Amino acid sequence: MSIINKIIFLLPIFFFGLLGQLSAEEIKKIGKFKDWEAMVVTEATGKVCFAQSSPILQAPKSNKRDAKLFIAFRPAEKIINEVSVTAGYEFNKNNSITAASGKNKFKFDIKEQGFAWIADTKIEYRMIKRMKKGSRIMITGYNQKGSQTIDHYSLLGFTK
């Protein structure tokens, strides 16, 4: 899937959470499972199912950001376990964005429009596998000024 299609898909979802302006017909909530929500949206290419979560802890505390972690499924495009994240700001292109759970670390390769993705589906698969076993995942990113932010996500409810 192209970066443009990913951005077109994620921006309305992000703003739905931020502003609550999309109608129930556009994004349908399937359910809330502890710290995760499952939703479905219909695009021109077909249905897209996704799970999302907000951080349970953010650093620095003084920054008010709408960070989210997403896992998307696009059956019509044969895409499963597509991992993406937004920290609520435009990422610095010179610094890495990483996810860490236990001793496992994963790097987000693609950064566009305030979102980041993992380019390699094998790495996404390993990350999902780790998320199913873990209790928390930590996303580290850097804003345009180079300041570090760390978002801690609970994995309770990730496997329903």
Task: Kindly label every feature range from the protein language model.
Residues 24-160:
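A generic "folded-domain core" signal
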Residues 1-9:
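Bacterial N-terminal signal peptides that target proteins for export
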Residues 9-18:
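Bacterial N-terminal signal peptides
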Residues 18-24:
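Sec/Tat signal peptide C-region and signal peptidase I cleavage site
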